[in-house]
Amino acid sequence: MGTCLEVMKMKTLSLELAKLAMNLVEEVEKDKRDDYLRDVKGLGSMIVQNGLMGTILFLKKKGKNKVVDHLGKMIEHLTLEDGIVERLMENEFLDARTYLKAQIAALECAKWLKRCGEVLLGGEENETT
């Protein structure tokens, strides 16, 4: 079990991610909210199945730039690594440790984007109204 200070740091970081995700999701244009929500709902499983690089390439190819941008901003915030997504897109070498750190961060970020998306953009309970 971690010390009280470690637990407080984790809670603070989690709160920071939640706020960042909320701010990012709120900037999604009204006419793109349904697509964005659908994309972030599947983001975590996509990262698990295809890895971070595969997910980013797929999303870019499909024109899901807002999701990629938001994921990149959150990964940078969590890892303190600048331009991870851009570096991956430019095929810049990343050592295994940096890549895995970014991929683990991406999973945490995907969770917050999904949660905020469901709350702010409609979620399942509002799909029938």
UniProtKB/Swiss-Prot annotation:
Subcellular location: Cytoplasm
Organism expressing this protein natively: Thermotoga maritima (strain ATCC 43589 / DSM 3109 / JCM 10099 / NBRC 100826 / MSB8)
Matches recorded under InterPro entries: AF1862-like_dom_sf, CRISPR-assoc_prot_Cmr5
GO cellular component: cytoplasm
Keywords: Antiviral defense, Cytoplasm
Keyword Cytoplasm attached: yes
Keyword Cytoplasm in record: yes
Protein name: CRISPR system Cmr subunit Cmr5
Family: Belongs to the CRISPR system Cmr5 family.
Function: CRISPR (clustered regularly interspaced short palindromic repeat), is an adaptive immune system that provides protection against mobile genetic elements (viruses, transposable elements and conjugative plasmids). CRISPR clusters contain sequences complementary to antecedent mobile elements and target invading nucleic acids. CRISPR clusters are transcribed and processed into CRISPR RNA (crRNA). Part of the Cmr ribonucleoprotein complex.
BP term (GO), one: defense response to virus
NCBIfam families: cas_Cmr5 (TIGR01881)
Broad class of the protein's primary localization: cytoplasm
Pfam family, one: Cas_Cmr5
